[in-house]
């Protein structure tokens, strides 16, 4: 297995460092006891109650009632973190691609790197999340991306969102997030500022259809 991505020493903007998860997220989903959210999208409702989390889309990488849940925020850019500087810090010298957006993945381990990518890329460190998407957190994939021989599509994030066992199930019952299919097009191709709208559209709804009480209109 490849060496895990080390923690990034580049300072994050103070606004990002202050980004903490509110006391309670809100979700809307039926049959919560039977359905795993792994490989799906959590889409923030207008009633989220915290402007720092408005229009948030989270790709769920793991979820079980015994171990809790883990996901990556898809639409919160990290300003002030340059990909080329990151490569220099990690002593990656074979560089054909030196420009790649660095996204904010969540409030846990905010300087640790995680890469979502298409399953055409195979490595010992890759963990399949769905038929189309894998998660890798090793230096090997970052080297390959920089060298131009990485996966067809990829998404680099710092940090992740995590839930203790039972926490996510409790939050789902509060009715304030929607759950959408984990469309690879939304994960990799949609513009950052369009992911929320595209995730809603994948369910056949728009922001104007959402009721102020947290469910569908």
Describe each region flagged by the PLM.
Residues 5, 26-28:
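Short hydrophobic targeting helices and cationic amphipathic motifs
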Residues 5, 12-13:
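Short, often N-terminal, low-complexity regions
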Residues 29-217:
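A short aromatic-anchored loop/beta-hairpin motif
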């Amino acid at each position: 297995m490849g060496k895990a991505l080390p923690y990034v020493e580049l300072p994050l903007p103070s606004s990002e460092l202050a980004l903490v998860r509110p006391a309670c997220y809100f979700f809307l989903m039926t049959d919560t006891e039977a359905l795993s959210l792994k490989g799906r999208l959590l889409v923030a409702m207008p009633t989220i109650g915290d402007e720092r989390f408005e229009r948030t889309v989270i790709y769920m990488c793991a979820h079980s009632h015994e171990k809790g849940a883990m996901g990556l925020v898809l639409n919160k850019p990290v300003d002030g973190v340059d990909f080329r500087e990151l490569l220099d810090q990690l002593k990656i010298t074979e560089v054909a691609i030196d420009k790649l957006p660095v996204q904010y993945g969540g409030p846990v381990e905010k300087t640790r790197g995680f890469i979502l990518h298409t399953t055409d890329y195979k490595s010992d460190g890759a963990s399949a999340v769905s038929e189309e998407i894998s998660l890798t957190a090793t230096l090997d994939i970052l080297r390959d991306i920089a060298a131009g021989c990485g996966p067809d599509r990829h998404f680099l994030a710092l940090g992740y969102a995590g839930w203790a066992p039972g926490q996510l199930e409790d939050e789902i019952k509060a009715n304030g997030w929607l759950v959408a299919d984990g469309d690879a097009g939304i994960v990799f191709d949609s513009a950052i500022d369009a992911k929320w709208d595209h995730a809603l559209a994948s369910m056949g709804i728009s922001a104007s259809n959402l009721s102020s009480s947290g469910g569908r209109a």
